[in-house]
Regions:
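Conserved protein kinase catalytic core
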Residues: 29-31, 158, 194
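Short, glycine/acidic-enriched loop or turn micro-motifs at the edges of active sites
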Residues: 26-28, 155, 191
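Substrate-recognition/cap helix-loop segment adjacent to the acidic, metal-dependent catalytic center
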Residues: 109, 126-148
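Acidic, Mg2+-coordinating catalytic module of metal-dependent nucleases/exonucleases
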Residues: 118-125, 129-130, 134-135, 167-225
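Acidic active-site catalytic centers that drive phospho-/nucleotidyl reactions
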Residues: 23-25, 127, 152, 188
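Catalytic phosphate/metal-binding cores of nucleic-acid and nucleotide-processing enzymes, i.e., regions
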Residues: 141, 160-162, 215-219
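Active-site-proximal helix-loop-helix substrate-binding element of RNase H-like nuclease domains
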Residues: 62-78, 82-85, 153-189
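Conserved non-catalytic scaffold segment of RNase H-like nuclease domains
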Residues: 2-122, 225
Length: 225
């Protein structure tokens, strides 16, 4: 790899967008009516070899907003116990959770010479919908994420590994997946991030991404000289 900085590689790889993996656990399927109960995030960076790797992690238990609906079927699916003393002690408001997350995201955007973050998620439209609804409820003016574009690992996994379920896609990629920790926003975000990196790096190793090809051509010319 020639002397191209990590920040430059990241900013050029995704057209100035910094990919940030988001996972949410909720009280249902309606982002405007149902509660946002957990949010997890994994930021990404590049190593000196140009490989995409997981970086900082963030997770928060969230107190349901006033008037929020919580379906019992959703709690049964996620295993979240709203009456858990540990959860009640740790839970914060949507505003506080997003404020802390966005502070970390903005810092990472700046350090990677990017202009904005882009949400990466497994079935990304679901996570994006709940994130945008929470941003609207909290009247957050400076949203670091692109408001509608996203990168979906369910679709990418179908292309790369022939799987769309997160656990099965991880298995196909050789990534350990603990079913007991599934549907924890922090864990799912970290596993999704590892899966996304696997797909992007595999594509690069197979000869994709224009910057990689340019770098290889430059290295070849330098060797000839």
């Amino acid at each position: 790899m020639t002397q191209v900085s990590v920040a430059t590689m990241m900013s050029q790889r995704f057209r100035g967008y910094l990919p940030v993996v988001i996972d949410v656990e909720t009280g249902g399927f309606n982002p405007r009516q149902d509660a946002l109960l957990e949010i997890g995030a994994t930021l990404l960076t590049m190593d000196e070899q140009g490989q995409l790797v997981p970086d900082q992690q963030f997770s928060a238990h969230i107190t349901p907003f006033e008037g929020a609906n919580v379906e019992q079927s959703a709690l049964d699916f996620t295993g979240i116990r709203l009456d858990s003393p540990l959860r009640q002690q740790a839970a914060v408001s949507e505003s506080d959770a997003l404020g802390e997350l966005f502070k970390q995201v903005r810092k990472a955007i700046k350090s990677h010479d990017c202009t904005r973050a882009i949400l990466v998620g497994h079935n990304a439209a679901f996570d994006h919908g709940f994130l945008n609804a929470a941003i609207e409820r909290c009247v957050i003016k400076r949203n670091p994420f692109h408001p509608f574009s996203s990168l979906d690992t369910a679709s990418l996994s179908a292309l790369a590994y022939g799987q769309t379920v997160l656990a099965r896609a991880c298995q196909a990629a050789g990534i350990p997946f603990d079913q007991q920790n599934a549907h924890s926003a922090g864990y799912d975000a970290e596993r999704t991030a590892t899966l996304f990196c696997s797909i992007i790096n595999r594509y690069r190793d197979l000869g994709g991404w224009e910057l990689t090809l340019r770098e290889q051509a430059m290295e070849a010319r330098e060797e000839e000289e």
